[in-house]
Curated annotation (Swiss-Prot):
This is GTPase Era. Coiled coil: none annotated. Residues 150-152 are annotated as: G5. The gene is era. PROSITE patterns: G_ERA, KH_TYPE_2. GTP binds at residues 11-18, 58-62, 120-123.
């Protein structure tokens, strides 16, 4: 009997939701960063084997929004509670339930969909007793069907998580062909890969005010080289200088690192050109939010 279903991955920012999804499908389809609110859209990823197909919805981290972009991100995350077969609530190795996790738990109490708690980052725990205490702490909430400890970064116990998910799926069709692992267009994936490198190179300087738009993407006649032109948008002139760096070094580093990942994604040589432009307060301008792909589908 072949099983299939839709599984939503929810949690507060920076608990490893995207890392988990990338590990399960075996490809980088969601960008990873230690900066909160890295994921901005609900990303659909597909895991398929001989017995099942799981369609994962990786959501933005649930947080208190400060602008229109933040409002969209929270809406996308909470909408992912609906019309799915299973919810994975991902938490990290924190010893206490903080206000962010508490808010999500209270939101989940009214949800009828089965919920599995995924305790991530167990590789950072020194003692087994620490993990036991975390599991016991969350189990007292009384809303989780099962609790599965994993390390998404190390790939530890993710195979067990897949088997647990399988138990909650019903007989169903393949929604996507075997080769398909995401519904994200190539342009979106490329823009997100570039944004990942920007976040990496900027450290904590200006991560949330950055967006990337692909202006041109065209294969040359021999199709061995793909020309990609992209604009990195920021909100202040001072931010533009930080992104470019002294003598353009930081922008060159971003471009070199992004090009390597894009070449792996497309399987072609990439000629990548990057520009930096300023658009003040774009996170509160709906037309820019839409243009950057952060809109309801």
């Amino acid at each position: 009997m072949f099983k299939s279903g839709f599984v939503s991955i929810v949690g507060r920012p920076n608990v490893g939701k995207s890392t988990l999804m990338n590990n399960v499908v075996g490809e980088k389809i969601a960008i990873m960063s230690d900066k909160p609110q890295t994921t901005r859209n609900t990303i659909q990823a597909v895991y398929t084997d001989e017995e099942m197909q799981i369609v994962f919805l990786d959501t933005p981290g649930i947080h208190k929004p400060k602008n229109k972009l933040g409002e969209f991100m929270v809406k996308a995350a909470t909408e992912a509670f609906k019309n799915v077969d299973l919810i994975l609530f991902v938490v990290d190795d924190s010893k206490k339930i903080g206000p962010g996790d508490r808010k999500i738990i209270e939101d989940l109490r009214s949800v009828k969909t089965p919920i599995i708690l995924v305790v991530n980052k167990i590789d950072q725990l020194d003692q087994k007793d620490e993990l036991f205490d975390i599991i016991k702490m969350y189990d007292r909430e009384g809303i989780f069907k099962e609790i599965v400890p994993i390390s998404a970064l190390k790939g530890k116990n993710t195979d067990t998580l897949i088997k647990v998910i399988q138990n909650y799926l019903e007989e169903g069709p393949k929604y996507f062909p075997d080769y398909m692992i995401t519904d994200q267009p190539e342009r979106v994936l490329i823009a997100e890969l570039i944004r990942e490198k920007v976040l990496h190179y900027l450290n904590d300087e200006i991560p949330h005010g950055v967006a990337v738009e692909i202006e041109k993407m065209k294969a040359r006649n021999d199709k061995e080289i793909v020309d990609v032109s992209a604009v990195i948008y920021c909100e202040r002139d001072s931010h533009k200088g930080i992104i470019i760096g002294k003598n353009g070094r930081k922008l060159k580093g971003i471009g070199k690192s992004a090009r390597q990942d894009i070449e792996l994604l497309l399987g072609s040589q990439i000629n990548l050109q990057l520009w930096v432009k300023v658009k003040e307060n774009w996170r509160n301008l709906q037309n820019y939010i839409n243009n950057f792909g952060y809109n309801d589908k």
